[in-house]
Amino acid sequence: MSDSKQYIMTAEGVKKLEEELEYLKTVKRREITEKIKVALSYGDLSENSEYDEAKNEQAFVEGRIVQLENMLRNANVVDESEISLDAVSVGSIVKVKDYDFDEIIDFHIVGSAEADPMENKISNESPVGSALIGKKVGDVINVPVPDGISKFEILEIRV
């Protein structure tokens, strides 16, 4: 299965994926191998839930390793020194006024592979992220959301 999709990422995002990959290849693989050995020592595999669970975990981890390797191989890393402060782009940190909640929020615009809404890292492909891309300080955007339309004003763009 060859996936040649390009993954737009920040250098920080690449580093996190590399760290996760290293952890899975070293620590996690070793843990799973040990679980399989212990489960095999119980004998009969036909009713060995520990063995089945360890093999399922192994399959998940190996799948994630393949996914991470592919993402890193096809990463298109955004050079922070080339990020314009004139308009929002991947890598920008955007201070916006959220008119729905009357609050100021900082969004870090990242590629989809490193999006984490809990840390206000939003994908350039998300509704809010894609609406912000290319906009300038002072622009007001209206973004369709499940509850209607959300309104944001761009207050600041930084790296």
Swiss-Prot record:
Which Pfam families does the UniProt entry name for this protein?
A: GreA_GreB, GreA_GreB_N
Family classification: Belongs to the GreA/GreB family.
Quote the protein name from its UniProt record.
Transcription elongation factor GreA
Coiled coil regions in record: 14-76
Write out the transmembrane intervals: none
- Recorded GO MF terms: DNA binding; RNA polymerase binding
InterPro entries attached here? GreA/GreB_C_sf, TF_GreA/GreB_CS, Tscrpt_elong_fac_GreA, Tscrpt_elong_fac_GreA/B, Tscrpt_elong_fac_GreA/B_C, Tscrpt_elong_fac_GreA/B_fam, Tscrpt_elong_fac_GreA/B_N, Tscrpt_elong_fac_GreA/B_N_sf
Q: Which gene encodes it?
A: greA
Among the GO biological process terms of this entry, one is:
DNA-templated transcription elongation
List the signal peptide residues: none
Q: Any idea what job this protein has?
A: Necessary for efficient RNA polymerase transcription elongation past template-encoded arresting sites. The arresting sites in DNA have the property of trapping a certain fraction of elongating RNA polymerases that pass through, resulting in locked ternary complexes. Cleavage of the nascent transcript by cleavage factors such as GreA or GreB allows the resumption of elongation from the new 3'terminus. GreA releases sequences of 2 to 3 nucleotides.
What are the alphabetically sorted keywords of the record? Coiled coil, DNA-binding, Transcription, Transcription regulation
Lineage, top-rank taxon, reads Bacteria
Q: Which organism is it from?
A: Clostridium novyi (strain NT)
HAMAP family reported in the protein's UniProt record: GreA_GreB
Q: PANTHER family under this entry?
A: TRANSCRIPTION ELONGATION FACTOR GREA
